Amino acid sequence: MSLITRLLTGNNHLRIRALESLGKAGYSSHAKFSEHKPIERIRNIGISAHIDSGKTTLTERILFYTGRIAEMHEVRGKDNVGATMDSMELERQRGITIQSAATYTLWKDTNINIIDTPGHVDFTVEVERALRVLDGAVLVLCAVGGVQSQTLTVNRQMKRYNVPCLAFINKLDRLGSNPYRVLSQMRSKMNHNAAFIQLPIGVESNCKGIVDLVREKAIYFEGEHGMDIRLDEIPQDMRVESLERRQELIEHLSNADETLGELFLEEKPFTEDDIKAALRRTCINRTFTPVLVGTALKNKGVQPLLDAVLDYLPNPGEVENLGFIEKEGQDPEKIVLNPARDGKDPFVGLAFKLEAGRFGQLTYLRCYQGVLRKGDNIFNARTNKKVRIARLVRLHSNQMEDVNEVYAGDIFALFGVDCASGDTFTTNPKNNLSMESIFVPEPVVSMAIKPNNTKDRDNFSKAIARFTKEDPTFHFFFDNDVKETLVSGMGELHLEIYAQRMEREYGCPVTLGKPKVAFRETLVGPCEFDYLHKKQSGGSGQYARIIGIMEPLPPTQNTLLEFVDETVGTNVPKQFVPGVEKGYREMAEKGMLSGHKLSGIRFRLQDGGHHIVDSSELAFMLAAHGAIKEVFQNGSWQILEPIMLVEVTAPEEFQGAVMGHLSKRHGIITGTEGTEGWFTVYAEVPLNDMFGYAGELRSSTQGKGEFTMEYSRYSPCLPDVQDQIVRQYQESQGLAQPDKKKKKN
């Protein structure tokens, strides 16, 4: 059904008005949305922020004003419909966004692809993926909360991928909103060279409109849903302030932009176009952040934000995307991908998200170079598998529209492609080209999981297979010793959400056990081995001898395992070396000290011996097993634990209590800062000591404190913690020895 038909079903005032505005914009039907634009008329943007800053509401308003949806719904609205972008039932219930839905829309004849990203720290891999494929972003800040912990995380990720951004201070209508404080936090906490390009006309309940400092006009949003925009002179009582703020904007811009700086020094007058051009240049170079204001819920400031996206954020042709050509024994060669939409260069695309929906597996891709048409063949650069394109679709949250071709800069989806997120697709498998893969953190928490009813086993395995494919930070394995299935992820909330999705989407209620920490075992110092595996009792025997050293890797590499073949000559024939490595990696899955994986170890195979008949790969594999057991007996071992970066924010009067609790949990406080009655503590705390902290923090700060944590590194745990872990493991294995030593008086 075309947009026009949908608007005509029902005669309410709003739909007629929307129809008129669409008529003015010249939209005739969905055909307008799916036609291809020149590269200057395309924007790929993400909307990311801290939890509850109003990202999804803002996206909903953008879709409404651009004529993409005919009516608006609130995230936690009374009509229980939920926002368009929150398409998962669980998201609508909790009012948080878990998966980034991709949508495209049209504003002033420019095609905007929007990716709505989650703001919760447990879902950072979603944000990482979204930022990887964007050209620009809108950072949404709450006018009350300001720069919060997750805002800083998102800011770090934007820096990692060099994403230019605009800042939008939302929720001006909330009690206690203070956009000026938020701006000073952006400068102090995030080190942004930022300044207002708009000012609010009144805050809290008397928020009337905004002042545009570039055009020196006041903007009012009138009519139902703020669809009519009225420009007026700046109110008398705000003229002095807006002049001062405009001067401040020009000074900040002049520091970052040479062209404007010269005009500033020569004291020449500035035109509106000079400022706009300087804003665009500095924003794309990430040397200045324009700050806009508004309130999405009360429909103020959204249309000027859309204008700013077109004016200041880059199109796909202005962003440099690199591909890497792998060459054996050399560093990969970097090449710049050509973003032109002419289809002359071969197709290159990156899969950034997988979803298993009701239509089978859906893979979201971004096209970086060339053109892709229905019926083409493409190759997965990692597996070299060929894929034939049967259907190409563009996404609008969870509805889709078929297209016949996509060009560089487009975001689209394919069906039934077997791949992992971060895979590169090309038309020529021989050029060994790949985009750099997306950075994925290691999981830090694991929990036992089991379906409540045995009859749900099939659905349970379907759900697990789908979630592990979609989310590289979600792992699943079966522990043979305790006969438990374990899932591991980035935090307790991460795993709880998956447990609830199993119940809701697959009708399979599950029980989660107590959280367990992913410890690791490593060597303290180098240890030599010389092991002979010999079994020659008749028939074909087994014979293998290996000599070498196992040694610890430096602390920065303590999550890796290395195998080095240093053999010379034919004492250990080369065809048997993989057997030794295989045996080493098998034994590394489970240490003998506490049953956790080994890490941070280098296995150096230096020499050995073989038998002309009885040696085999299996014999050398078993020899590696024996050598590692020997090193367990002779070497000294220690246990590593994950250390988390924890950040706690609470009112000043609770500072003593909060710092006391962190010290009690073996935390090392790395820094503190305070602003206007609130303080923030940064600490490094072992994950093992962080369970149950949320409840303790709430009770000790009267519910006002909040904290976030993210994985930092592995480091050796305290001796008493190590003794306790070893003792628990030995008891569970039935190896505990009674203590025979008597105390002497």
From Swiss-Prot:
Binding site for GTP: 49-56, 116-120, 170-173
Keyword Mitochondrion in record: yes
PANTHER family registered for this protein in UniProt: ELONGATION FACTOR G, MITOCHONDRIAL (PTHR43636:SF2)
Entry-linked SUPFAM superfamilies: EF-G C-terminal domain-like, P-loop containing nucleoside triphosphate hydrolases, Ribosomal protein S5 domain 2-like, Translation proteins
Residue intervals of the tr-type G domain: 40-317
Keywords: Elongation factor, GTP-binding, Mitochondrion, Nucleotide-binding, Protein biosynthesis
One annotated Gene Ontology cellular component of this protein: mitochondrion
UniProt-listed Pfam families: EFG_C (PF00679), EFG_III (PF14492), EFG_IV (PF03764), GTP_EFTU (PF00009), GTP_EFTU_D2 (PF03144)
Subcellular location: Mitochondrion
Similarity comment: Belongs to the TRAFAC class translation factor GTPase superfamily. Classic translation factor GTPase family. EF-G/EF-2 subfamily.
Domain of life: Eukaryota
Organism field: Drosophila erecta (Fruit fly)
Name this polypeptide is given: Elongation factor G, mitochondrial
